[in-house]
Amino acid sequence: MNSITIDNDIIINTCSNFDNEQKKISLNTNINFIQFHFCLEGKVILNYNDRAYQFQLSENSSIILFNPSTNLPIDGELEKNSKYLSLLITIKKFHGLFSELTGNISFLSNENVDKKYYKENVISPQISTVLNQIINEKLSDNVKNLYLKGKIFELLGMYFNESNDLNIEQCPFLADEKNVVKIKKAKEI
């Protein structure tokens, strides 16, 4: 597992497994961190509390985990042909970034601040692009942390963006070119 500490509040962990067998992953955390886990390819299994809880993430899925009363160190497995990224960010840093949006992010609201939070999501093509940019960065050490911090902020902004007004014509990841043609024709009418 490749771990990069951006500062005391942000840690990125990446792991790829293109071997022919499962790869163990282990992350020590502390109670102050919100965990974001992203499976870009293959499958990852995340075990918590001596395997009492287990989350399986398939390709292009993610999960947010936060438990204000219990530390959540990770004991997991990365299946073969898999790519995984975790982002650990302190609740203090996260709350500082989103303080104006606490009403829009359910686990930051006053009534939920002391509650466990677990939520699975699908990774959008835009988020997948940012995740791959983080994983594949090849910058010199003097600008690496600045670049990665910017990408983390971009990732979080996209992750919590509630807008559904994406311009489908400009989406470079649109799987079906026929849909783009149909949309263009409909706009012309």
Task: Give the residues covered by each predicted segment.
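Short, Lys/Arg-enriched, Trp-marked, Pro/Gly-tolerant hinge/linker segments that flank
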Residues: 109-122, 138-147, 158-188
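N-terminal regulatory/effector-sensing and dimerization cores
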Residues: 2-105
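A short mid-domain helix/strand-loop element embedded in enzyme catalytic domains
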Residues: 94-97, 101-131
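Extended serine/threonine-enriched, polar tracts that run as long, contiguous segments within proteins
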Residues: 134-137, 155
